[in-house]
């Protein structure tokens, strides 16, 4: 029994270490096992034009504009004053800064249904404490960029009840013989914003500009449940390398690894539950850049060249900007691979089917809390044969525990003889001390995957269960579920054989207290899953142990 307990403790410890190491790498800290790999083409080479080719005028013209915070350059003296243009749709309230025609504030709104309250979260913002912007401009000459003040084209700024789309247009001043008209198109019920950049050559010579589209964000963390850390930072998706997360720490160390040139994919900023992404037209060649532009400010973007525009002619560059919740099915329909911003970590291959099943169950019951309960019940049913094998092994070990203790006492001065005697006992009684370990090992990845499913799913946000649980993404306000969790763990320890080692016995008694303290701050949906899982495990163990006990009694009576 001691050997089995030791193996289970090792498995538990290694699982915890792997989860911690995954969190370390997701937050820019060095891995305990894997060295950081430096990309062959660094971000600075891709964006700043430094190096062998950076000395020529073309590279200088294509350098990204400064003034990362959106302030006007010091050289622009009496310039037009920038204004904030407020707008609203059925899913957004926001502000567009006429300096650059930049999307400077965007609040996602979700109306309640009478049972649930209205929900809102601010994604883009530009305040003294937080910066998160979506902006565009031109490169390749002294052309309009995000530092220039645009003029708003007259038109409505709210989505009317009888309208399906809202268009907001902004016109730049003429610079370098070029004028830009930037148009945002908002569609009812959609988190995808159309962004059209019309480039007009009003000069006397041809121009060959490039359009840049970028997301600018500081590294301030978003609110997440205590002890539950999720990825925050830029991400790049291409057909070549698929989904590449980039930590702020890797950018700081110039170790960001990502594809720097493609004609497909998207770039994004990812945080818990929500993301933003620029999705250029497929087939259009673009350079990708990720860089640090201030001590706490970063940007990820694309530079897309435009064919030469003759005088009096114009060119249009269209792209889509996603800014919304990480709802998996919705993301799948927007762009290839966009659903990967919903980060399941290293258990994605198991977590995605689990979420699919959870979603199907929710479609039947209409409540995410009950869907969690039913999914846990289904998983326990699937693993019942494995659990039964584990509990049977534990029951058999419990039966011979007195004899094992007697052998340990008898041969305590001779460990070699003690081990030989224990092996002989196992052989005689046909008991495998590791027999209960394999079923547990097989189930661990599934339980960890379900943990990540419940932690990463924005569907839990604002979702009620019963009575006092009004939001499964928040902690239990009265700590009822964590207390039930502690009680269920305590009952489980009582059902298991008491370890012969007093220190180990005290540790097993202390575990329910330690875990319950941690679970006090976990989202209610996660704690609900663990409570249901523990209760079902207790029922399974009680049933199997009682069945085995009855069979043993009948055998003894006969």
UniProtKB/Swiss-Prot annotation:
GO terms for molecular function: membrane insertase activity. It is found in: Cell inner membrane. The keyword Transcription does not apply. Belongs to the OXA1/ALB3/YidC family. Type 1 subfamily. Interacts with the Sec translocase complex via SecD. Specifically interacts with transmembrane segments of nascent integral membrane proteins during membrane integration. Required for the insertion and/or proper folding and/or complex formation of integral membrane proteins into the membrane. Involved in integration of membrane proteins that insert both dependently and independently of the Sec translocase complex, as well as at least some lipoproteins. Aids folding of multispanning membrane proteins. This is Membrane protein insertase YidC. It comes from Burkholderia pseudomallei (strain 668). The gene is yidC.
């Amino acid at each position: 029994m001691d050997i089995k307990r030791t193996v289970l403790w090792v498995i538990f410890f290694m699982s915890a270490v792997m989860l911690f190491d995954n969190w370390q790498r997701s937050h820019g800290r060095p891995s305990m096992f894997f060295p950081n790999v430096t990309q062959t083409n660094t971000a600075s080479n891709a964006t700043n034009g430094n190096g062998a080719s950076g000395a020529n005028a073309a590279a200088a013209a294509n350098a990204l504009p400064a003034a990362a915070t959106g302030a006007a350059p010091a050289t622009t003296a009496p310039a037009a004053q920038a204004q904030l243009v407020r707008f609203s749709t059925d899913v957004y309230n926001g502000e567009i800064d006429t300096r650059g025609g930049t999307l400077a504030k965007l609040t996602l709104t979700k109306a309640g249904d009478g049972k649930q309250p209205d929900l809102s979260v601010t994604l883009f913002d530009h305040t003294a404490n937080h910066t998160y912007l979506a902006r565009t401009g031109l490169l390749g000459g002294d052309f309009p960029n995000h530092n220039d003040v645009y003029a708003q084209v007259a038109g409505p700024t709210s989505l009317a009840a009888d309208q399906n789309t809202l268009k907001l247009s902004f016109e730049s001043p003429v610079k370098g013989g070029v004028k830009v008209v930037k148009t945002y198109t908002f569609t009812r019920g959609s988190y995808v914003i159309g962004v059209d950049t019309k480039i007009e050559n009003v000069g006397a010579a041809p121009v060959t500009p490039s359009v840049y589209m970028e997301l600018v964000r500081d590294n301030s963390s978003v609110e997440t449940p205590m002890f539950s850390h999720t990825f925050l930072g830029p991400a790049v998706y291409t057909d070549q390398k698929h989904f590449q997360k980039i930590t702020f720490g890797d950018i700081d160390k110039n170790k960001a690894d990502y594809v720097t040139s493609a004609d497909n994919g998207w770039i994004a900023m990812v945080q818990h539950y929500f993301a933003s992404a620029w999705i250029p037209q497929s087939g259009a060649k673009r350079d990708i850049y990720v860089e640090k532009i201030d001590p706490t400010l970063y940007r990820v973007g694309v530079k897309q060249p435009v064919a030469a525009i003759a005088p009096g002619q114009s060119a249009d560059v269209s792209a889509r900007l996603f800014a919304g919740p990480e709802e998996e099915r919705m993301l799948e329909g927007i762009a290839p691979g966009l659903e990967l911003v919903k980060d399941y970590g290293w258990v994605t291959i198991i977590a995605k089917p689990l979420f699919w099943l959870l979603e199907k169950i929710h479609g039947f019951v209409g409540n995410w809390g009950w869907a969690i309960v039913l999914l846990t019940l289904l998983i326990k049913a699937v693993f019942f044969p494995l659990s039964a094998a584990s509990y049977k092994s534990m029951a058999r070990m419990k039966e011979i525990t007195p004899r094992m203790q007697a052998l340990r006492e008898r041969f305590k001065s001779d460990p070699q003889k003690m081990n030989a005697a224990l092996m002989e006992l196992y052989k005689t009684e046909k008991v495998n001390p590791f027999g209960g370990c394999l079923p547990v090992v097989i189930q661990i990845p599934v339980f960890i995957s379900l943990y990540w499913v419940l932690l990463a799913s924005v569907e839990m946000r604002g979702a009620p269960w019963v009575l006092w649980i009004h939001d499964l993404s928040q902690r239990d306000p009265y700590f009822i579920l964590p207390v039930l969790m502690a009680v269920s763990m305590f009952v489980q320890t009582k059902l298991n054989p008491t370890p012969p080692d007093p220190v180990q016995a005290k540790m097993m008694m202390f575990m329910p207290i330690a875990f319950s303290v941690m679970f006090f701050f976990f989202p209610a949906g996660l704690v609900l899953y663990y409570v249901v899982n523990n209760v079902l495990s207790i029922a399974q163990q009680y049933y199997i142990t009682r069945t085995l006990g009855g069979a043993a009694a009948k055998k003894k009576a006969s």
